[in-house]
């Protein structure tokens, strides 16, 4: 591989790494924040007629009468919504990236994720948190597109290296996301 091609490949793999890393950090950063978030939303809008109030009543009806049980239930619901949407949208984003190009789809999904994270930071109501997780889950299909991009820019001999970059980004995202969320929850 010539030097300019290798340099372009390294730069592109670096961007793929950053894309996947930020996606996983965004997914996992909320995990340690669930107890504080849910406590806040239950206290501020936990009455009947609100989304969190209805979920709170359902959790108590199912025997989730402790904060821990409610946190596990709500955290599980939000994580499941995110993962389900990622599962549904991965093939959609993949097909679109085949037609429109990997870069365009990665740009769209990164912008969507950035918007959802920005809205999440300023979410004054629980339904906004749910909405941001829905949008983020839809955009998380970009991991499949990033993997395809890594395969596109590597030849058969280098493909393992390209897939390793994606795998390392996922692993480090799951390491740093909860740590950042934990630090934020204790601040």
Explain the meaning of each model-derived region.
Residues 21, 116, 127-141:
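Hydrophobic core of transmembrane alpha-helices in multi-pass small-molecule transporters
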Residues 9-50:
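Pair of pore-lining "gating" transmembrane helices in MFS-fold secondary transporters
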Residues 75-93:
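Central cavity-lining transmembrane alpha-helices of secondary-active solute carriers
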Residues 163-181, 185:
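Glycine-rich segments within core transmembrane alpha-helices of 12-TM secondary carriers
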Residues 111-124:
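C-terminal ends and interior cores of transmembrane alpha-helices
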Residues 132-170:
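Cytoplasmic helix-loop-helix junction between adjacent transmembrane helices
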Residues 101, 122-127:
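Helix-breaking motifs and short loop linkers at transmembrane-helix boundaries and internal kinks
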């Amino acid at each position: 591989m010539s030097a300019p091609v290798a340099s372009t490949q390294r730069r592109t793999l670096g961007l793929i790494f950053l894309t996947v890393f930020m996606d996983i950090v965004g997914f996992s950063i909320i995990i340690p924040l669930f107890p504080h978030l849910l406590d806040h939303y239950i206290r501020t809008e936990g009455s009947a007629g609100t989304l969190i109030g209805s979920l709170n009543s359902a959790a108590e009806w199912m025997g989730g009468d402790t904060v821990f049980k409610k946190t596990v239930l709500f955290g599980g619901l939000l994580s499941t919504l995110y993962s389900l949407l990622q599962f549904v949208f991965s093939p959609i984003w993949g097909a679109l990236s085949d037609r429109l190009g990997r870069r365009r789809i990665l740009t769209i999904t990164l912008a969507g994720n950035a918007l959802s994270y920005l809205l999440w930071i300023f979410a004054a109501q629980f339904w906004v948190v749910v909405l941001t997780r829905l949008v983020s889950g839809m955009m998380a299909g970009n991991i499949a597109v990033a993997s395809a991009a890594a395969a596109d820019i590597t030849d058969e001999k280098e493909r393992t290296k390209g897939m390793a970059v994606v795998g390392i980004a996922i692993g480090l995202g799951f390491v740093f996301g909860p740590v950042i969320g934990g630090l934020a929850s204790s601040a």
